[in-house]
């Protein structure tokens, strides 16, 4: 993951949604969506509902 993708993933792990992440990183929500999509792809997460994929991404980040 890129450093920005790791930042986004860390904020996801803290429970922030896309809007809050965009605000904290001073980027557009569309940019956050792109980073989240890249995270899912790079972690090879299955195409399920977005909430489930976010949980899987956070678990991967935490090493669980």
What feature does the model see in each segment?
Residues 40-64:
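Basic, Lys/Arg-enriched C-terminal extension of HTH/homeodomain DNA-binding domains
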């Amino acid at each position: 993951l890129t450093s920005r993708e790791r930042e986004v993933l860390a904020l996801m792990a803290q429970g922030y949604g896309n809007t809050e992440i965009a605000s904290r990183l001073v980027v557009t929500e569309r940019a956050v969506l792109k980073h989240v999509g890249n995270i899912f792809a790079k972690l090879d997460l299955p195409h399920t509902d977005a909430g489930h994929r976010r949980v899987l991404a956070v678990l991967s980040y935490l090493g669980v």
